[in-house]
Amino acid sequence: TDLLQRDVVLSKTSDPEEIVEFIIRDIDGKEATLQITISLDESAGDTEPIWYKDIVLDAQGVTNGKSFVSLADGTTLNLQDASNNQSLINLLYYFDNIDADENTISSPGANIDDSIISGLSGWTTRNTSRFISKSMSLDDFEAINSVIYLVDEYHTSGNRKAKNLKVGDTFSFKDEARNKFGMFRVYEINGQENGSVTISIVIQP
């Protein structure tokens, strides 16, 4: 019998206990289930999140504009560099006047028309992130200093796009490729297809 080994990374919320269920199913439809209980160790403390502040992302009409973000280090990339480093790309910005989504932040795995970002649908690695809109003051956002808080705020499955963005909008998100939780806030929006957006991101290390 072949042995299957898989590393799994879990993010603990502030709940005292959580039950995680694993289901393993083979090609014949046979399955086995394993449940584990994860308890919160309050003595372990929390972890400081990482901040990427004042990131400027260009819309798709800006020549050689940097529309893509790697959440591993906050680097911004243009379309060509992003296409050459697909596995590193987690977020992107564009202006959508087709579906009336206008200023939008999504991930490569979202459904984005090829007329907006050429070639994206043909990427072999299209990481996904999901987003939940939050109501939060600027002071509260900039005071975030807890990874547990970031995990707690993403309490349900989010949407594939953060759309119709306005200054002050705040979103909780999950980087599904790396199983990391974070939040971003919109600080500035300029223009449309030839414009840009300025955001700050706080994320689990």
Regions found by a protein language model. Name each.
Residues 1-7, 11-19, 29-205:
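Surface-exposed, beta-sheet-biased, low-hydrophobicity segments with strongly acidic/polar composition
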Residues 24-26:
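Conserved structural position at the C-terminal beta-strand
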